[in-house]
Structures are given as structure tokens and as C-alpha cells.
């Protein structure tokens, strides 16, 4: 006879893990606009420079660039939400959340040492989120299809999902924010099908949830988080090839997916290319060395 109470506890633990991993995929860097419009509007802008800084782990420089963008575009919610992304990304780096093996190995992830979050950073992060949401909702009141506003709300929810799951370990709250971010991302894709960066919001989530056991996939699907392992990889590949701000991050997530799929060669190819593109990011050489030493 099945011990239903024990089964419920086991499935609850798996769902909590899925909540955390799903939050990770919403990630930190998500200004999605049409690729050709981005090239015309923001090439070499402070916003571009800021995200390059984040990929190079230059958080101080990135924050200066984001602040400069916000000063010149005070009504644009992308400014404050990018600042929030920079703050959270720096905290993740300090806490060790950005290590790829945590995605690959649940035991390593859940067994990592706990570090106290920075309360001052937390307050600044929430203030930037609140400011971005206020600006975004004001723009959506004027134009329900405003792409920058939809992006800002998507990223606000995604960042809060990440903080709740990975720092506060509030997994149910993280699932709530994850669903909000996915819904905003889908709405953006409806009005802008070639906003390729938006595919990352759902791509890694579909891949991770598609890798879970059937009962967990079923429960999460009821909660609005679909599972499609191969479709998720396809979405990531499109963002990696045709995205703008998120193309490098899609390559990072693809390399993680390849590690999980035991495709070491393709994972190393992506990580080596990322290391060449962002030489100041110490994560890439560490992960390259780890993969090479494992075989």
C-alpha cells in the first residue's frame, strides 16, 4: 500500500526544488526589444555597456552605466529595473549562486553554505523594483502593448522570484513571481514575436521542468509552468543566436543544459567562447577547468 503522506512530502520537496530552479531561469538580465530596434536605438549606449559590465562581473561600472541611462531616460522603467538586476547579480556572485555546478548538482546546490544577505542591498533592490513597476504601469495605462513596460514587469517579477528562491528560500513566493514573469513574457511575445530575448524567460523553465519526474511535471503544469525539454533548448538556442542583451546569458544556460545532458564538448565550446568574449568573468575559466578535470 502506498504511504500517501510520505509520497506527498517527497513530491513537495521536488516541487520546491523545481520552484527554485524555475526561478533561476528567469534570470537577471532581460531587456527584450526587437533585435534590429535595439541595434539602432541602444548600440553602445549606457544600457548596453551596463549589461556588458554585468557579464564581466564589473558591478560598480554597470551600476554607473545604468544610473546614467536612468538620468537621461527618467520615464523609462528599464533604467531602475536594470539597476535592480545589477544589485541582485552582484549579490548572487557574492553568495556563490552563479556557480554552474549548483544547476547541475542538486546536492551541491542545497548543501552550499549559507551567507547572510546584505540588508542595505536588499532595500535598494526593492526600491528599484518598486520604481520600475510604477513607471511600467503608468506606461501600460497609456499603451497596453508598450514593450519596454512589459519587459520591466517581466523582469521585476523574475528578479523577485530569484531573490525569494535563492536568498530568502521562500519557495512558494518564488513560484508566484515565476508565474507572473512567464505571463508577462508571453504577453510581450504576442505583441512582438521577434523579441527573441523574451524566449529565455520560458525556455530554460520548460527545459528544467521537462527534466523533472512525471508527477512533478503534472503538478507544475497545473500551476501554469509548462514542461517541454526539447522546446526549451530550442528557445534558448534562438535567444543565443538572435537575441541581444540576453544572447550571452542564453549561451550560459545552454552550457548548463549541455552539462546536464552529458554533452561536455558543446558545453566547453560555449564556455570557451564566453570566456573569450568576457575575459573578466572568472566563472567561465573555473567551469572550464572543472569540466576538463572531470574527464
For the regions a protein language model found, what residue spans apply to each?
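Intrinsic-disorder-associated, low-complexity terminal segments enriched in Asp/Asn/His/Tyr and depleted
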Residues: 3-4
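Short coil/linker segments at helix-helix boundaries
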Residues: 37-46, 53-66, 75, 86-145, ...
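N-terminal carbohydrate-binding/catalytic regions of secreted carbohydrate-active enzymes
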Residues: 82
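Bacterial N-terminal signal peptides
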Residues: 19-30
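Bacterial N-terminal signal peptides that target proteins for export
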Residues: 8-21
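A cross-kingdom marker for long, charged
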Residues: 256-295
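Sec/Tat signal peptide C-region and signal peptidase I cleavage site
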Residues: 31-35
